[in-house]
């Protein structure tokens, strides 16, 4: 269990051929209940360059300290930004954008859920995946008609009577699996918890920039109101009014 000492936060946001290390505000949203993560790069008044970005240009947002940056978002620009217009923000979506744009139209014979999902990912040009190793019966026939790859995964879940989560994290597709967690971070009152409040049936913990916390991970809390290990349901990192990144962890 590790308590991170957090000083000198840094940011780096890349979209297409542009890299921003200042003059931008960020918002990054990642939740168990949403199958895709999204982010926004907003330009502050100093930055008024004309942007030329195309939908599906690659995008990465990194946060960190003392020169060590971690990916907090990987994905793509979610729309076209024409050089002739002043855009004050760029919207990004993770790899699920490619799945939403991939159409599946086929009848599948003698298949398992994992075989189908691997095929849908390949059709979207994606190969990094971690799929449940549980054994499911093969299905004699499953017709999928003009559905996006996301709808097709939902059709697979329904066909086998499964309610299992699927999402991308760090560019890897997970189906009924969780991203590996190398260490459990500790959040302690007076050390790295800026605020802890109960809102809408969940706890919201405000801390400084914490790019290493992902949804479905466990964290350890030392606080009079809550203590022990909890599982993270949502992580939102954004620039506050003073220009500092704050991470909000929900559980």
Which sequence ranges carry the predicted segments?
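Short beta-strand-centered interaction patches in the first periplasmic/extracellular domains
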Residues: 2, 87-97, 130-199
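Short, compositionally biased
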Residues: 75-83, 142, 231-242
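Juxtamembrane "anchor/assembly" segments of surface/extracellular structural proteins
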Residues: 1-52, 95-97, 179-251
């Amino acid at each position: 269990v590790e308590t991170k000492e957090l000083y000198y936060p840094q940011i780096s946001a890349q979209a297409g051929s542009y890299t921003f290390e200042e003059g931008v505000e960020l918002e990054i949203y990642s939740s168990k209940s949403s199958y895709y993560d999204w982010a926004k790069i907003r330009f502050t008044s100093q930055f008024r360059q004309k942007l030329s970005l195309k939908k599906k240009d690659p995008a990465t947002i990194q946060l960190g300290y003392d020169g060590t940056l971690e990916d907090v978002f990987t994905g793509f620009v979610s729309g076209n930004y024409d050089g002739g217009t002043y855009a004050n923000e760029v919207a990004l979506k993770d790899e699920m954008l490619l799945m939403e744009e991939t159409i599946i139209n086929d009848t599948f014979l003698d298949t398992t859920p994992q075989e189908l999902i691997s095929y849908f990912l390949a059709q979207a040009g994606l190969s990094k995946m971690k799929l449940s190793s549980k054994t499911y019966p093969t299905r004699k026939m499953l017709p999928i008609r003009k559905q996006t790859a996301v709808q097709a995964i939902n059709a697979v879940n329904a066909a086998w009577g499964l309610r299992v989560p699927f999402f991308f994290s760090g560019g890897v597709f997970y189906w009924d699996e969780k991203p590996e967690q190398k260490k459990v971070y500790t959040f302690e009152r007076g050390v790295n918890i800026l605020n802890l409040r109960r809102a809408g049936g969940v706890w919201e913990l405000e801390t400084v920039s914490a790019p290493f916390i992902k949804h479905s991970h466990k964290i350890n809390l030392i606080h009079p109101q809550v203590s022990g290990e909890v599982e993270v349901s949502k992580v939102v990192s954004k620039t506050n009014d003073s220009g500092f990144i704050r991470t909000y962890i929900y559980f």
